Amino acid sequence: RDCLLSRGLGDVYKRQDFMQAKIVVREMAEQLAMDLVEKKLVTDQIVLTVGYDIDNLKIPEIADHYHGEITVDRYGRSVPKHAHGTGNLDAMTASVSRITETTMGLYERIVDPMLLTRRITLVANHLKDADSVKEEPFYEQLDLFSGGFLQTGQKETSRETKQLEKERLEKEKHLQEAMLSVKSKYGKNAILKAADLQEGATTIDRNRQIGGHKA
């Protein structure tokens, strides 16, 4: 059964620069992927929206060099227009590596590194039940430059690459499921990465929240 829904994470954070917000976006991408695995869902599209801080245009070092679009918020205050973009995955997936890679590429592409951020929203679109998605068959690729199909050696290399990637994703899925099992039993902070302990990281605090609010 196709879910045809979206699922996402979003919050308002303290004012952050480009690199600080980048840490948060990576955490959100990893958490979104874990949420999809937990719900047995897959996606093929990621949407990222980053809202900029109201004080950007009050800081001379930023305002004097910003030449992008300016909007007015509901309070009548001028603020740089938010960044918004879509990243498409090459297949339906809940892979943390693929979702994170797509999200970070999107962040680098759409966010102005000069501006301070305030609000971040990350959404997975086109959700489907993981069990309803069948593996895509392997097709020989037509090489227009040589005027024919790929040679046997090239086809074998493509097949081997595809098989290796399939095995890698399967191992990653099992690891994600194992992590979810441990967190379910011992708490969300039972497993942390070194990146979760660096300055600006929010995973630990977010894991302590209930219904989106700090307990």
List each language-model region with its residue ranges.
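Basic, low-complexity intrinsically disordered segments
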Residues: 1, 7-215
